[in-house]
């Protein structure tokens, strides 16, 4: 199932709490998933219209040779008349 590639929502930082006010949600997803797949998963699971999908891979921790983060951080912008967190 495609939803298994979404690891968890990110709501633990100050920036992500500010993003929620702008109708943006942050998720950590598998590195193999693409932007169109992310858009499809979010639209089907939450029944919202996704306006934009931005992705980036966070920098790896120092002193860990040979390892990369096994996740990609995604910021999804949804339509303004929808609230996901009630």
Curated annotation (Swiss-Prot):
Its main location: plastid. InterPro entries: Nucleotide-bd_a/b_plait_sf, Ribosomal_uL23-like, Ribosomal_uL23/eL15/eS24_sf. Signal peptide: none annotated. It holds the Pfam family Ribosomal_L23. Binds to 23S rRNA. PANTHER family: 60S RIBOSOMAL PROTEIN L23A. This is Large ribosomal subunit protein uL23c. It comes from Chlorella vulgaris.
């Amino acid at each position: 199932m495609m939803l298994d590639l979404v690891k968890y929502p990110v709501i633990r930082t100050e920036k992500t709490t500010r993003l929620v006010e702008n109708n943006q949600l942050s998720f950590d997803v598998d590195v193999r998933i693409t932007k169109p797949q992310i858009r499809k998963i979010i639209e089907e699971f939450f029944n919202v219209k996704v306006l934009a999908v931005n992705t980036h891979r966070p920098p790896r921790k120092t002193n860990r040779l040979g390892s990369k983060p096994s996740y990609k951080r995604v910021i999804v912008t949804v339509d303004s008349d929808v609230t996901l967190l009630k």
